[in-house]
């Protein structure tokens, strides 16, 4: 049996690599929004949309009158078209809403499928158009690499997810036995209690982290730029990064617990 697995690692790009990542993120967002704008016109007229291959064939012509698109990874631009095609397929199959325009605020990411260039070694990873990038991760995919997704989180930290295929033995279903069953019940002054008498208390670090984020958000609301329509000052952006990092810290605490 073949399974898709992924390794997510934080990366530390230098100034030049960081610039290239930000450029690719912006160009992929531009392609996605431009294709969505064109597909919206087609949908209003004929209730259909351009498929992936039709959108992909438009890219070479766009690069002729928009030469700055050549700065980005070509595979990443194609994958932006593929994402939009998937979104429209979900919409027409009534499993999702109408696709929305991408914004430069919040989490951003792009995916590259050039597997001939993608390489993972201990403490470094090689990506198309970027070269080798430092990472604290020592795990190496033990299968064939499918694609890599580079993301910029709201706390200004860069990550890459390497998706690969791995062949594993077939899973044998386990038949539950009475002696292997554990019952859980609600505990009013804690988290839970099990059928063996073991109890677990509610972790207090989560509430403490939430209170810290509330204080940071209160300071953010007093900075110039917190009101709608105001220009975002440098102090506002600095405080916003602190809030985002605290939110990421809380999410990691919940995930680890």
Indicate residue ranges for each PLM-predicted region:
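Generic detection of short hydrophobic beta-strand segments and adjacent strand-loop junctions
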Residues: 7-11, 133-136, 200-202
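Gly/serine-rich nucleotide phosphate-binding loop at the start of the catalytic core
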Residues: 1-77
């Amino acid at each position: 049996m073949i399974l898709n697995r992924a390794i997510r690692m934080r990366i530390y790009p230098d100034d030049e690599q960081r610039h290239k990542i930000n450029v690719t993120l912006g160009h992929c967002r531009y392609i996605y929004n431009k294709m969505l704008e064109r597909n919206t016109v087609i949908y209003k007229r004929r209730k259909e949309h351009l498929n992936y291959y039709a959108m992909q064939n438009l890219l070479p012509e766009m690069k002729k009158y928009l030469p700055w698109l050549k700065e980005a990874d070509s595979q990443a631009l194609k994958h932006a078209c593929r994402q939009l095609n998937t979104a429209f397929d979900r919409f027409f199959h009534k499993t999702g809403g109408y696709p929305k325009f991408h914004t430069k605020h919040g989490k951003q990411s792009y995916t590259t499928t050039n597997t001939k260039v993608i390489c993972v070694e201990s403490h470094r990873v090689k990506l198309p158009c970027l070269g080798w990038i430092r990472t604290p991760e020592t795990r190496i995919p033990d299968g064939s690499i499918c694609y890599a997704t580079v993301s910029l989180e709201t706390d200004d930290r860069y990550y890459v997810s390497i998706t690969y295929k791995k062949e594993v033995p077939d899973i044998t279903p386990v038949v539950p036995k009475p002696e292997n069953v554990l019952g859980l019940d609600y505990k009013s002054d804690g988290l839970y209690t099990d059928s063996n008498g073991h109890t677990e208390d509610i972790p207090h670090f989560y509430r403490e982290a939430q209170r810290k984020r509330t204080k940071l958000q209160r300071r953010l609301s007093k900075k110039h730029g917190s009101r709608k329509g105001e220009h975002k000052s440098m102090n506002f952006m600095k405080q916003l990064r602190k809030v985002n990092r605290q939110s990421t810290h809380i999410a990691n605490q919940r995930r680890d617990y």
